[in-house]
Regions:
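Trp/Gly-enriched beta-strand/coil motifs that build multi-repeat beta-propeller-like domains
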Residues: 1-194
Length: 194
């Protein structure tokens, strides 16, 4: 709802989704039932049109993903089917080019990772295949060098973690092996105060 406080989407035992608008104290200010989606799951959230309100991507088995561009009230402003993506899996949503709009990394059935730079209409402005990552596992994203562009940590087949600082065009500015972490597992990609 663009108030600067993250909301929460819950799935109840009856498979209905409920959106909680949160306040700074940690309790809900109001709730909204997201109807007619009992067989769908939330696969990504982010501000996919740059209006300051978080949006939702839904998917159910065998279906095309459905993008909801949201209003501040928690109602749907525009619903868009993301065509030809029934077999694609989203791995991350973040602003990978510092334009104020959340972008999406997808994994295709051929194991290629594709970065979608999103535009204000809620569709991809440009796409980029992230080369040579077929056997790598996406692990985390965050702005690890404070340049306004989100970066990526991958886990390679040899269990080494690779930190990739991204440029605005989706290319890797710097790749850095995070040494001595082959037997470690990432627990949380954000810590308190960040």
């Amino acid at each position: 709802n663009s108030d600067g406080v993250s909301g929460v989407i819950w799935k109840r035992p009856d498979n209905k989704h409920v959106l909680w608008f949160m306040k700074k104290t940690g309790s809900a200010t109001s709730t909204r039932l997201l109807t007619a989606l009992t067989t769908w799951n939330v696969i990504a959230t982010g501000d996919f049109n740059g209006d300051g309100v978080s949006d939702i991507i839904w998917k159910r088995p065998g279906s095309q993903p459905l993008l909801w561009l949201m209003n501040k009230t928690g109602t749907v402003k525009i619903a868009k089917v993301l065509t030809a993506l029934a077999t694609w899996t989203p791995y991350a949503s973040a602003d990978f080019n510092d334009d104020g709009i959340s972008d999406i990394i997808w994994k295709r059935p051929d194991n290629k990772h594709v970065l979608w730079f999103m535009k204000k209409t809620g569709g991809p402005k440009t796409t980029k295949v992230l080369a040579a990552l077929d056997t790598w596992v996406f692990t985390a994203t965050g702005d690890f060098n404070a340049d306004g562009i989100f970066d990526i940590i991958w886990k390679k087949p040899d269990n080494k973690y690779l930190l990739c600082f991204l440029n605005e065009d989706g290319t890797f500015a710097v790749k850095k092996i995070l040494a001595a972490l082959a037997t470690w597992n990432l627990v949380k990609d954000k810590v308190a105060g960040e």
